[in-house]
C-alpha cells in the first residue's frame, strides 16, 4: 500500500476530483490511476480534451458546472486550462501558460501518448494551431480576485525542461511552490508535494485548523 494512503486513508473522502490532462495525453493517462490510488475514497473524473483550445475550454467549463468537483487538478496544458476554471479549489502542476512557445518546436505529426475515446492516435501541429494557443493563453490571469488567489496552488518542478512559468504564475497567485523534479507528475512528486497540498485543501474544506501557509511551503519545498 502507498505509504501516504496508510497515513491519510481518508484524503478527500467522499469528494470529487476533476483531472485535466496535458498536451498529447488523454483521460487514460497513468496520472489518473495514480491519483485514484492516492485518494481511494474519492471520485475521480476525467475526459479527453479537444485539441482546439476554444472547444477545450467550452467542454471543461461545462464539465466543471455539471460535475461540481471539490478540487480540480491540471497538469501542463491542463494546468493552463485549470487556471481559467474559476470558482473551484485548484492545483496547477507545471502549468503551460505559454503553450504557443512550447509547441513551436513540435510542428509536424505528433502521436498521442495515451489512447483516446475518439480513436485518434496522432495530431498535426501546424502554425495555425500554434497561433490558436498563443492567442488563447492571453486569457489567463484575468479578473483574479483575492478569493481566487486563496483557491489556487501552483507546483513547479525545479528541473522542468519544458515549462518555465513559476515567475509568471507568482505575479498573480501567492501560493507558488517549487518541488524537486521535472515536468511529469511521477509518483514521488505526487507523494511528497502534491498530496500535502491536497490535504491542506481537504482540511480547509472540512473546517480543520490550518498551519501557516509559509511553514507549509517551507516543509513541502524541502521534502526529498
Where are these regions (language model features)?
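Short beta-strand-to-loop junctions in surface cap/lid or active-site-entrance loops
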Residues: 2-13
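Gly/Ala-rich beta-loop-alpha elbow adjacent to hydrolase catalytic centers
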Residues: 73-83
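Active-site catalytic motif of lipid deacylating hydrolases and related acyltransferases
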Residues: 11-66, 183
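Single conserved hydrophobic/aromatic residue that forms the stacking wall/gate
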Residues: 211-224
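The alpha/beta-hydrolase serine catalytic core
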Residues: 89-209
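Short hydrophobic segments within beta-strands
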Residues: 19-23, 73, 155-157
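Residue in the alpha/beta-hydrolase core beta-strand immediately N-terminal to the catalytic nucleophile
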Residues: 70-73, 89-91
Amino acid at each position: 500500500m502507498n505509504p501516504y494512503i496508510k497515513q491519510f486513508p481518508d484524503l478527500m473522502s467522499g469528494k470529487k476530483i476533476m483531472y485535466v490532462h496535458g498536451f498529447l495525453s488523454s483521460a487514460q493517462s497513468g496520472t489518473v490511476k495514480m491519483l485514484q490510488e492516492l485518494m481511494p475514497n474519492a471520485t475521480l473524473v476525467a475526459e479527453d480534451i479537444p485539441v482546439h483550445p476554444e472547444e477545450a475550454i467550452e467542454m471543461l467549463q461545462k464539465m466543471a458546472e455539471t460535475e461540481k468537483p471539490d478540487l480540480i487538478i491540471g497538469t501542463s496544458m491542463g494546468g493552463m486550462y485549470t487556471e481559467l476554471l474559476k470558482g473551484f479549489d485548484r492545483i496547477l502542476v507545471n502549468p503551460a501558460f505559454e503553450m504557443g512557445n512550447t509547441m513551436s518546436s513540435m510542428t509536424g505529426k505528433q502521436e498521442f501518448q495515451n489512447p483516446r475515446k475518439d480513436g485518434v492516435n496522432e495530431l498535426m501541429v501546424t502554425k495555425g494551431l500554434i497561433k490558436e494557443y498563443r492567442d488563447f493563453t492571453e486569457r489567463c490571469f484575468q479578473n483574479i480576485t483575492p478569493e481566487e488567489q486563496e483557491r489556487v496552488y501552483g507546483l513547479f518542478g525545479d528541473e522542468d525542461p519544458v515549462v518555465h512559468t513559476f515567475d509568471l504564475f507568482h505575479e498573480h497567485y501567492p501560493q507558488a511552490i517549487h518541488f524537486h523534479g521535472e515536468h511529469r507528475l511521477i509518483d514521488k512528486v505526487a507523494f511528497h508535494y502534491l498530496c500535502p497540498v491536497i490535504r491542506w485543501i481537504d482540511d480547509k474544506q472540512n473546517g480543520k485548523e490550518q498551519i501557516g501557509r509559509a511553514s507549509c511551503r517551507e516543509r513541502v519545498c524541502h521534502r526529498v
